[in-house]
């Protein structure tokens, strides 16, 4: 099973999708002449990103995510400048085409904005979890009685009998 990958000035090449996503992206990166350090992804003709660069398991086969005989575009994932506060921010998804369609650029921009908003939202949630003070369970109100633990609700532990307890009782009765 093969797909068409377009790039540059209306150039294209075939790629076999009976391989891992990682291998497919390495192949595409080499074919378009990008260094290994560049983050790339594929998008379909409508501009829908496949988000392979976010995959937890890049060893999964590409044929699970791509349709044979379809055309895909190579897109470069631009992130924030290294060493800055916005280092992991998503700046843009840039199609590696000489004259991309305006609809394609709009679709990629929209997806990039959504992904960035989602990333920022997750960061805020993580920061909020770190800031929330944890109350001691001693001061919490008991659900069954409505009284706090400090007001003297004492619970008796169940009496556990061991084998030694039974043996000593038998000895007492003899």
Swiss-Prot record:
Pfam families: Il2rg (PF15874)
InterPro entries in UniProt: CXorf65-like (IPR039471)
Domain of life: Eukaryota
Basic and acidic residues composition-biased segments: 162-174
GO biological process terms, semicolon-separated: transcription by RNA polymerase II
Region (Disordered): 138-174
GO molecular function: RNA polymerase II cis-regulatory region sequence-specific DNA binding
Name of the protein: Uncharacterized protein CXorf65 homolog
Lineage, opening ranks: Eukaryota, Metazoa, Chordata, Craniata, Vertebrata
